[in-house]
């Protein structure tokens, strides 16, 4: 299967010095090298066509012992895509199951860490429109008969230790079922046979029970896309104590009393300058926080589901002028917004979801889909902090973030030279460098531009840099709102198109002249200004009322919000500016200043952050290409996380360790 569920990275056994992103397939193949089951006979090398499942879906050999290092030199080479749609790792069981559903039914299930986790999912995504279709799980032995086309899921253990397994039921016979799968049998199927194994089925008054051909495995059950929930399993939820956060400390042996970062490296030097020293936060350098593996799984599921929910809300907004007007985006730009959504809906690189996670549950505050930060600390600095500290428990849940970003860039439409546009800001310096590293790793050239310095027009009106390279692709740290502010200032009611300059050497190139230029491919796309705007929150609530990850939100104060408390947020605010937290009886719990006080506001149900060791803690997850990419933690002594709030080391602990060491 594809990934270690806590986000752990395994070393590629063919190259001990190369870290690979979330490659549980290496872990699985290492085991099978020395402990290969006698039930599996390997004849055909990795990638060989073994046969076909119904619908002409190819089944490939996944004998990793025979994978060619030249053809598969790194982790990215193992990733399987059909067009823009990611299937999984070649040629794992999950890759086959997702590809089967995609080709035969036009649906896919959300990304998972291990095959057995599929049994906890409750929706499939329809690829053509991102509609969420109900998916029900039926336990092995229940009264709901399995049917052809169902997913069949195994628990981790035995032949499928660590990962579990997934197959497709192709036929249901009176006393057996036939299945198609990958990563079990590596030899060719008989001509015309469209199944890999036949499993006995016991039928009784109690229900239908499937037996595996391996005697050390457990079949969890089958999954059917249906609205009918009779005999189905409820969606599992982690117990409340699993969603708590813990504080841990390493022994102070002077590890952080001196210089532990490399001041000669530009990235390190920029980070040190921004932090005013060699430190991971402005608080205790020897403290870190931990969450359970169950909590991490819940965050993965929430991230994947919420991203799709935000896409649905964005689609609704862009189809309704009455909703779009709440976002305070100049009407001059509405056609561009809709074109961006139509043409670049799936061309995102990364964003960040902000959560409150505690024993009360998991709730999302907002989605920074436009100009997210925190990647550099989570994907680089926190690893080096842990190495310097020594004796740190668990794993960094963003360990593979840079690799994930590099892979996403490889499958993007970006030109070979990407210009990174950033503000004159110390923090943005190292954020830009981190993304530059990911781009270079992906095989691109990346040039950092501060503001619009060095950009100008040639004699034909093309936008070029100071080395005469044409600007074709831009990744920006700027929020789209900054450009919108410029547009509001410069555009007049007489304008019939965005006022983009295309010449005049004496004129200074403005941000708007870069980001709105039609031939410049900007990441993140213009449409991400919609999900990043707080005005999306009431739309989300109207589409998915009482959803377990959402907080009530409204454009106007409601009796329920007044009674139970609310947060007042400016619709295009950033960095926690101009937020008011109002408790019961209209009591002011907290308020922040900032530059967004004149904006319209939305009102969101009050849901305060948990406090651990006098720090209010906010969990954040990264999306990469629309899928979960990592987790980080921010903290502050006040209830509102702001731009200058700390990042904190975060580790994922196995549940038994988490509960055994809970303080």
Label for each model-derived stretch:
Residues 119-184:
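...with weaker cross-activation on analogous glycine-rich loops/strands in unrelated enzymes
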